[in-house]
Design a protein with these regions (language model features):
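Secondary-structure boundary elements
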Residues: 35-97
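Long, contiguous interaction/recruitment modules in multidomain scaffold/adaptor proteins
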Residues: 89-222, 236-244, 248
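Canonical positions in the second alpha-helix
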Residues: 210-211, 244-245, 278-279, 312-313, ...
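TPR alpha-solenoid repeat register
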Residues: 221, 255, 289, 322-323, ...
Length: 366
């Protein structure tokens, strides 16, 4: 497994952990999904977009010969030699945008590596990563931004190239192959999440409705669609969408959190309690679900209960956002020293993270 360091050329290729693998659909393409969305007036992007001159240059200077793993290293060195140091940022960019900006999130760097790798003849595709990725709270609901990596070769003779920013050798990462259209749907779901966070809930809903219809086997899409529906004052439809999704994805923890939010929005406390109990049965050790419980308890002003949930989520898997919310819960409970320690830990984990900086400004000087 290759994790994203400051210096691209310093990385090494290792065999990754693969699980729950499915066949990549040969007919799936990211540009076809984009074209279908554009035809409906949706601002969909092709994550693999890369200027032809960049592709021609990498082919000329890296070449198509040599072992695949050696060629992959040459692509990374070529990037560093031509573009210098790349920086992690919370923006989701296409391959071309990441190349020009020299920054982006794990999705952006994966897009760039796959586009360049394919240009030099590498057999490389997306894989979905199940871990604590980017998650954002919006008025008590739970939006999920997808984390992907690249796979060189095919299982079992494969290498995983993962551009996540925080390596953790003690964490089990499960990988599942993705077709290009699936990856493009997740990429555009991330863009729709940003639309929602920026206050454009109606466009986010339209994008997510389209994407979930195109790729119904990706739970993130229907999860985020339900949040958009809720934000657009369509709680009954959001409830129906979530109930159907829970039947199809009974172990996807964010669905329980959002279904609880919608039930409370509709004034159905009994259903919310039932959903919490069901979610606890399947997801008590899932840091995403535990974090969502913390958000609900914080919203109920149960700050001690929220702190317990946020601390458990952070201990299940290191997360700057969980530590930041732990700081918020401690401070709301009047526990200033505990809040100071938690926020300092969050800043140390992700000093440039936009959410952490916003929280730091909100809480003021500690």
């Amino acid at each position: 497994m290759l994790r994203f360091p400051v210096t691209l050329a310093a990385v090494g290729l290792l065999v990754g952990c693969a699980g729950q693998r499915v066949a990549v659909r040969a007919d799936a393409s990211s540009d076809a999904l984009q074209a279908a969305g554009l035809a409906q007036g949706l601002p969909l992007r092709n994550p693999l977009e890369l200027p032809p001159d960049v592709m021609a240059q990498v082919v000329e200077e890296v070449g198509r010969d040599g072992r695949p793993d050696t060629r992959a290293h040459r692509v990374l060195r070529w990037l560093e030699n031509h573009q210098g140091t790349f920086q992690y940022a919370s923006e989701t960019y296409t391959a071309g945008e990441a190349f020009e900006a020299k920054r982006g999130d794990c999705f952006a760097f994966t897009n760039l590596f796959i586009a360049l790798g394919r240009a030099v003849g590498l057999q490389i595709h997306y894989v979905y990563v199940r871990e604590v990725g980017a998650f954002q709270e919006k008025d008590g609901s739970y939006l999920v931004s997808s984390h992907v990596a690249a796979e060189l070769g095919t299982f079992p003779d494969n290498d995983i190239i993962d551009f996540a920013r925080t390596p953790d050798a003690h964490t089990l990462y499960m990988y599942r192959e993705l077709g290009d259209a699936e990856a493009a749907a997740l990429f555009n779901s991330n863009l729709a999440v940003q639309q929602l966070l920026d206050g454009r809930a109606h466009m986010a809903e339209r994008m997510l409705r389209f994407l979930s219809e195109q790729e119904p086997e990706l739970p993130e899409l229907v999860n985020n669609l339900a949040v958009a529906l809720s934000r657009n004052h369509q709680a009954p439809e959001a409830r129906a969408v979530l109930n159907a999704a829970l039947e199809h994805f009974p172990r996807y923890a964010p669905l329980y959190t959002n279904a609880m939010s919608v039930a409370l929005q509709l004034g159905d406390g009994v259903e919310a309690q039932d959903l919490e109990a069901r979610g606890r049965e399947v997801a008590e050790d899932d840091p995403l679900y535990v974090f969502g419980q913390g958000l609900h308890r914080f919203g109920d002003r149960d700050y001690a209960g929220a702190a317990e949930r946020f601390e458990r989520a952070a201990n299940l898997q290191e997360s700057a956002v969980a530590w930041a919310w732990l700081a918020r819960a401690h401070l709301a409970a009047g526990q200033r020293s505990e809040g100071r320690r938690a926020l300092k830990h969050a800043i140390a984990l992700a000093p440039g993270d936009v959410q952490i900086q916003e929280l730091q400004s909100e809480l003021g000087s500690l």
